[in-house]
Swiss-Prot record:
Region (Disordered): 167-203
Reaction(s) the record says it catalyses: a quinone + NADH + 5 H(+)(in) = a quinol + NAD(+) + 4 H(+)(out)
Function: NDH-1 shuttles electrons from NADH, via FMN and iron-sulfur (Fe-S) centers, to quinones in the respiratory chain. The immediate electron acceptor for the enzyme in this species is believed to be a menaquinone. Couples the redox reaction to proton translocation (for every two electrons transferred, four hydrogen ions are translocated across the cytoplasmic membrane), and thus conserves the redox energy in a proton gradient.
Biological process annotations from GO: aerobic respiration; electron transport coupled proton transport
EC number: 7.1.1.-
Membrane topology: Peripheral membrane protein
UniProt keyword Coiled coil present: no
Protein name: NADH-quinone oxidoreductase subunit B 2
Length: 203
């Protein structure tokens, strides 16, 4: 007779946990204040806007003074994702995957015209018409490319949004599923359509 105890399955944790949801209003203010001034940023740099992002992080503009810590080791350590540059349909699944690897609560700044709506390449067959077709965006920074001061203004707008954020409002609505956001251009081929079928393989 097997006497091995059955493993106890813990309930699936909610995104923020019951304690964070039940926190009194003053505690929520403290939580929002902490998130607001300790944003580890992950830059998904795709084009010339990424150069302006780097300029904003250097000594002249220095967005560290706003509480934004640049160059997180990876998406799993990041709170803020800045998408800067042209997002192509082939790159879209990678953007979505990196976004999903970020822990909650997470924020996205769309930096530049290409990231906002496709920019000068909007009519190309291979360009995604805005990163908000793939992931939710919190702040849009217009420009082609935007100046570093524009990114600083976008960061301040995001911090204002975080300061008045309610956890129930942010996480009350379900996020779109990954399947709903996949492009037909990047779907794997159906089974039996590749090499080795009856037409191309040995008979």
């Amino acid at each position: 007779m097997d006497v091995t105890p059955e493993p106890v399955l813990l309930p699936e944790p909610k995104r923020l946990g019951a304690l964070a949801r039940l926190a009194p209003e003053p505690m929520k203010v403290v939580l929002n204040w902490g998130r607001r001034y300790s944003l580890w940023v992950f830059n998904f740099g795709l084009a010339c806007c990424a150069i302006e992002f780097i300029a904003a992080s250097m000594a002249r503009h220095d967005f560290i003074r706003l509480g934004v810590i640049p160059f997180a080791p990876g998406p799993r350590q990041a709170d803020l994702m800045v998408v800067s540059g042209t997002v192509t349909d082939k790159m879209a699944p990678a953007v979505k995957r990196l976004y999903e690897q970020m822990p909650e609560p997470k924020y996205v700044i769309s930096f530049g015209a290409c990231s906002n709506c496709g920019g000068p390449y909007w009519d190309s067959y291979s360009v995604t018409k805005g990163v908000d077709q793939i992931i939710p965006v919190d702040v849009y920074v217009p420009g082609c490319p935007p100046r570093p001061e524009a990114l600083l203004q976008g960061i301040l707008k995001l911090q204002e949004k975080i300061a008045r954020e309610s956890l129930s409002e942010r996480y009350g609505s379900p996020r779109p599923s990954a399947a709903a956001l996949q492009s037909d251009l990047v779907r794997p081929p159906a089974a039996g359509t590749g090499a080795g079928t009856a037409e191309g393989g040995a008979r």
